[in-house]
């Protein structure tokens, strides 16, 4: 055990013209020092995407917080959410971040942009293991935490920001990393950092 604690903040941005966001975030405290955070992104936008992402995040966060394996979680999601008949892709993607005893971080990622970790002011390249569960390519990582580590999880709404307009090819992950590195030493809260990223996505 150590004296570290997690500061969590997030922002959601509705698709233009939609009343509901297609992304959903769930945060569940397993105990005083362990937290499960799930970001799910429903296919499309609006009401349908919101329902799908909410269902996905609720299922995963609840199952993981109860100690069930990621294999069980993914199999349940696969059985619950159908695959789009037109695109042939799952109706919802997800990113799971679990803080264990404020000492380790476990990441499970499916079809969202990979989590960005900033450590000592720079991007930290962490190892990941590829798994195939129910035909889905899942990436699993586990790292030791250090003080002032910053984890940035996002849906593809960030990397598609400005496509064909302000940014011809969207906002690339490496450009997001470079942008967020500039705020590392400022001491902003997680909520402020997520707001900065959110606002930059719509500029």
Sequence positions of predicted segments:
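Beta-strand-turn-beta hairpins that frame and shape the catalytic cleft
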Residues: 3-6, 31-34, 101-104, 146-149
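Residue-level marker for buried hydrophobic side chains located in beta-strands
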Residues: 38, 109, 151-153
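Catalytic core of PPM/PP2C metal-dependent serine/threonine phosphatase domains
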Residues: 52-121, 138-139, 186-203
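Active-site-proximal, acidic helix/loop segment immediately C-terminal to a metal-coordinating Asp/Glu
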Residues: 45-66, 151-197
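Regulatory cytosolic signal-relay segments
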Residues: 1-20
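Acidic loop->beta-strand submotif enriched in PP2C/PPM serine/threonine phosphatases
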Residues: 18-32, 125-163
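N-terminal glycine-rich anion-binding loops that anchor highly charged ligand groups
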Residues: 26-35, 45-51
């Amino acid at each position: 055990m150590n004296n570290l604690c997690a500061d969590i903040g997030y922002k959601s941005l509705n698709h233009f013209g939609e009343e509901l966001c297609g992304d959903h975030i769930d945060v569940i405290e397993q105990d005083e020092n362990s937290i499960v955070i799930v970001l799910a992104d429903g296919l499309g936008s609006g009401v349908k995407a919101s329902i799908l992402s909410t269902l996905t995040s609720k299922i995963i966060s609840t199952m993981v917080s109860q100690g069930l394996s990621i294999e069980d979680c993914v199999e349940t999601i696969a059985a619950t959410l159908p695959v789009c008949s037109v695109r042939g892709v799952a109706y919802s993607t997800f990113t799971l971040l679990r803080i264990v005893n404020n000492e380790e971080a476990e990441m499970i990622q499916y079809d969202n942009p990979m989590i960005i970790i900033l450590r000592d002011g720079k991007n930290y390249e962490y190892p990941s293991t590829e798994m195939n569960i129910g035909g889905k390519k899942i990436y699993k990582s586990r790292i030791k935490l250090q003080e002032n580590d910053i984890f940035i999880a996002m849906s593809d709404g960030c990397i598609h920001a400005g496509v064909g307009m302000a940014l011809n090819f969207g906002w690339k992950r490496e450009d997001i990393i470079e942008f967020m590195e500039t705020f590392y030493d400022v001491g902003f809260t997680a909520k402020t950092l997520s707001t900065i990223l959110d606002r930059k996505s719509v500029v």
